[in-house]
């Protein structure tokens, strides 16, 4: 007679948990920064907080957000020759949690000539982010962005945070007063 209760059963739960943690880490790392490579340039863009004046609340909504968020672009020359000077054109869409219209801020930054394998970082497009945390993501301002690198008037590389950026930008209200980050 075989005793089926004596043998230990295989428990797949720890492996599933481990796999979920690995997948969550991979998605978190890829969502943190958007990277593109084209025409000998690598463009990596991430959001960065340059000023933070959040207040801890004990009221109904939780903590109140009040920060300046900007874009940080790392541009690397992947080719074996020097890249000429260029310009970085950017646009940031800001959807306020308490406002129906989407605002668009635009600007242009100079890009210095890059030697082979040289990296330069630019911080631009500062916008005020407000809202409340603790109960719902719906009470926080949201941003989307698009960045284009041009050399000699020709588009070299373009990156955006969402595929729907162009259609969202068509309906946005134009603003030219994006804040200059303090970096």
Residue ranges and their predicted role:
Residues 24-33:
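Hydrophobic h-region of N-terminal signal peptides that target proteins for export
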Residues 75-79:
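Asparagine-centered strand-capping/turn motif at beta-strand->loop junctions
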């Amino acid at each position: 007679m075989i005793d089926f209760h004596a043998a230990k059963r295989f428990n797949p739960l720890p492996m599933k948990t481990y796999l979920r943690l690995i997948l969550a880490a991979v998605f978190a790392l890829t969502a943190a920064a958007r990277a593109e490579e084209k025409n000998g340039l690598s463009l990596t863009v991430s959001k960065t907080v340059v000023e933070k004046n959040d207040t801890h609340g004990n009221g109904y909504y939780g903590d109140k957000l009040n920060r300046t968020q900007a874009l940080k672009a790392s541009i690397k020359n992947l080719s074996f020759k020097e890249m000429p000077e260029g310009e970085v054109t950017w646009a940031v869409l800001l959807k306020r949690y308490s406002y129906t219209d989407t605002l668009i801020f635009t600007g242009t930054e100079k890009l210095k000539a890059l030697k082979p394998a040289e990296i330069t970082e630019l911080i631009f497009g500062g916008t005020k982010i407000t809202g409340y945390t603790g109960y719902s993501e719906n009470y926080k301002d949201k941003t989307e962005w698009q960045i284009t690198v041009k050399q000699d008037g020709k588009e070299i590389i373009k990156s955006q945070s969402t595929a729907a950026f162009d259609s969202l930008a068509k309906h946005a209200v134009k603003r030219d007063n994006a804040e200059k980050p303090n970096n």
